[in-house]
Amino acid sequence: WYSKETPNSSVGNFGIIINAKADLIREKFFWKNAANTNLSWTKLDDKDDDTDSEDFEVATDIFNLSSLYGYNLTKNFAASAFAEYRSSLINNFNDPGFLDLGVGATWTPFSDLVVVIHPLNYNFVFSSSGNSYESSLGAKIVADYKKEIGNLNIGSNLSVFLSYQDTDYSNYTWTNNLSYTIWKNLGLG
């Protein structure tokens, strides 16, 4: 058992998660689009410290848009093009911002899993602050798993950029979620 660092305190949290998708599935091609936003704020009220902040502070600030177009070569394999944009919304929008554009292949071994492998991908990095970020050519690998079991929704998305120029320019994002649908599209997660 560990005691907390500020024993005479209370914490409040508030968060909003929005996941939207629009898919077009045809016999010869598919087009999958997704938008994900995860925002949360937290407030620590230390009763022993009169100088602590009265405001909620940003705890999570994630914004992601992606679009995948594929032309089916077989039932589970397609030639594809992929675009993905990642940044924050509340603090430092587009600083940094990451835009990936690439071509390659998409494998769907079963309906709940999509694996994107694009050996020709350019990772554009935007930054207006003094931080040093570099755009570069590389490979993009994305694995997206979604499963619904009754009202329980499980999801995991791994997005990896591997720079051909320097491993320091590589980056990844791994997002997992678990939610429960209460009524129609309203849920807890």
Model-derived segments and spans:
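Repeated loop/turn-to-beta-strand initiation elements of outer-membrane beta-barrel proteins
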Residues: 28-31, 76-79, 111-115, 146-155, ...
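Transmembrane beta-strands of outer-membrane beta-barrel pores
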Residues: 1, 26-28, 37-43, 83-89, ...
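Hydrophobic/aromatic-rich structural module bridging two neighboring secondary-structure elements via a short loop
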Residues: 43-100
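Residues that define the transmembrane beta-barrel architecture of outer-membrane proteins
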Residues: 10-16, 59-63, 95-101, 131-139, ...
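Outer membrane beta-barrel transmembrane domains
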Residues: 135, 148-189
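Residues on the lipid-exposed face of transmembrane beta-strands in outer-membrane beta-barrel proteins
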Residues: 16-24, 67-71, 85, 103-107, ...
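Surface-exposed strand-loop-strand hairpins of Gram-negative outer-membrane beta-barrel proteins
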Residues: 1-16, 45-55
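Detector for outer-membrane/organellar transmembrane beta-barrel domains
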Residues: 98, 102-163
